Structures are given as structure tokens and as C-alpha cells.
């Protein structure tokens, strides 16, 4: 069995291992943390399987570790403080419904990290081409946007009741979902860094940022949060004005006063 197959199996096994106690306890508190753990584990398996590591290998590995660790801790703290995650309110009581989320997480990790994993496992010269530098700039920009957005939202939720008021300050005055824009941007950066190392069929892994975009804007993320926000704040004129004047995803350069 090759290392690539082993990594996919590990991603699935981790979900099963943590799904069982989570279902028995009817809790979703560890879901996002396990997602981050799966990123860390699978990318680490790829990285430490390579004998002659290059600069690009180490950069990609470092970027994924930093992103997964920060996001996992942030999401775990959020669900712990909130006491629940609205995504799983009904699903966690039904075995197969809840299991679908966990298996979906294995797919999410595998497709999102595929470019990073294949790039690490692919042999390439230990150089840092201009294309990789462009990718690094994209990753750093995306990571900064996502981190700042999450921090601003965490501070807002501490000072306000999210069931009564919505965040529309900071980066959230420029985009209704700046954190998702940041995540899409940073995974695009990883794909650009990986581009120089891929050959043949490996170019298929460039689906990574496309999958992240589709997942966050079409399958979950934006659609779910927009629906929840409409239900909570749809009666507020300032919310309707915010929706009219603020892009869903790509931040605008200027911000309007709400």
C-alpha cells in the first residue's frame, strides 16, 4: 500500500474513532477539532515520509500546520463557549445522519489538502521559484484575513448578543463573510506553491481551492449562515441595508456606514 492510500485511510479512521463517542454522548464539540487533527496528521504523514525534504515541502507543511492549529482551536473554543453548533442540532441524534457529517469531513480534508500532500510527496528541486513566492503571498494574505475576521467576530460575540445584533464592523463591513474569503485565498496560495512540483495526473489536485470555494459558498458555510442571519435579523432595516451594500464574499475597498 502506498503512502497516499494510507493517508486517505487514516483520514477516514480518525473520523470513525471520534464519531462513535461523539454520537453516544450526543455532542458535536470535538467535530471541528478532529477536522484540524486530521489535517495535521495526514500532512505530517506525507511530510515525514519524505527523506530529502525541500524548502517548498517545509513551507507547505508549516503553512498547513499553522492554519489547522489556529482554526481548530478557534472553532473548539467557540462551540465550547456557545454550548452547541446549530449545524448539528438535529443530526447528532441520528446515527447515519451524524455519520454523514463525519465522513464528509474526511472527504473535506482529503480534497482540500490533496495539492499540499501530493506536492510534498512529489520530487522537485530545492528552489523557490517566483510562482511559489506568489503562492506564499496569497497564503499570508488569506491567513491574515481569516485570522483577523475570526478575532473580530469573537470580540463582537463577547460584547453583544448574537441573537439580537449582527457584526458589521472591521473586515465584516467590507464583506459579509471575510473569513471564508481568507480561507479560499490561502488554499489558492497553497495550490500555487504546489503548481511547480506537480506533473501529469497530479495536476488534478489543483481542484483543492475550487472545492473549498464550492464547499464554503454553495454546499455549506455562506448559504447556511445567510439563512440563519435572515431569520434573526431580516426584520431590521440596518441589516437589509448591510446586505444591499456589502458583498457576500470578495471584500470591497471602501466600507459604508450602517
Describe the role of every protein-language-model region.
Residues 25-41, 83-101, 165-172:
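Juxtamembrane helix-capping/reentrant segments at transmembrane boundaries
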Residues 16-27, 73-80:
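C-terminal ends of transmembrane helices
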Residues 5-15, 38-69, 109-152, 158-258:
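Hydrophobic transmembrane alpha-helices
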Residues 1-3:
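Short, small-residue-biased leader/transition segments that mark boundaries at the very start
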Residues 31-33, 96-109, 176-183:
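Select subsegments of transmembrane alpha-helices in polytopic membrane proteins
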Amino acid at each position: 500500500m502506498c503512502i497516499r492510500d494510507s493517508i486517505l485511510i487514516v483520514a477516514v479512521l480518525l473520523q470513525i474513532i471520534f464519531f462513535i463517542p461523539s454520537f453516544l454522548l450526543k455532542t458535536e464539540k470535538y467535530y471541528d477539532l478532529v477536522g484540524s487533527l486530521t489535517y495535521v496528521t495526514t500532512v505530517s504523514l506525507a511530510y515525514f515520509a519524505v527523506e530529502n525534504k525541500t524548502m517548498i515541502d517545509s513551507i507547505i507543511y508549516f503553512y498547513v500546520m499553522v492554519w489547522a492549529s489556529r482554526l481548530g482551536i478557534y472553532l473548539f473554543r467557540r462551540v465550547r463557549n456557545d454550548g452547541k453548533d446549530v449545524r448539528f442540532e438535529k443530526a447528532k441524534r441520528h446515527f447515519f445522519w451524524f455519520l454523514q457529517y463525519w465522513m464528509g469531513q474526511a472527504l473535506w480534508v482529503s480534497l482540500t489538502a490533496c495539492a499540499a500532500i501530493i506536492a510534498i510527496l512529489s520530487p522537485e528541486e530545492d528552489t523557490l521559484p517566483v510562482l511559489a513566492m506568489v503562492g506564499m503571498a496569497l497564503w499570508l494574505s488569506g491567513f491574515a484575513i481569516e485570522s483577523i475576521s475570526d478575532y473580530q467576530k469573537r470580540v463582537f460575540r463577547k460584547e453583544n448578543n448574537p441573537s439580537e445584533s449582527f457584526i458589521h464592523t472591521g473586515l465584516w463591513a467590507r464583506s459579509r463573510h471575510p473569513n471564508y474569503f481568507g480561507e479560499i485565498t490561502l488554499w489558492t496560495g497553497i495550490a500555487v506553491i504546489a503548481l511547480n512540483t506537480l506533473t501529469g495526473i497530479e495536476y488534478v489536485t489543483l481542484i483543492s481551492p475550487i472545492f473549498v470555494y464550492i464547499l464554503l459558498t454553495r454546499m455549506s458555510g455562506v448559504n447556511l449562515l445567510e439563512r440563519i442571519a435572515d431569520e434573526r435579523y431580516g426584520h431590521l432595516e440596518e441589516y437589509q441595508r448591510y446586505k444591499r451594500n456589502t458583498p457576500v464574499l470578495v471584500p470591497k475597498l471602501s466600507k459604508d456606514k450602517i
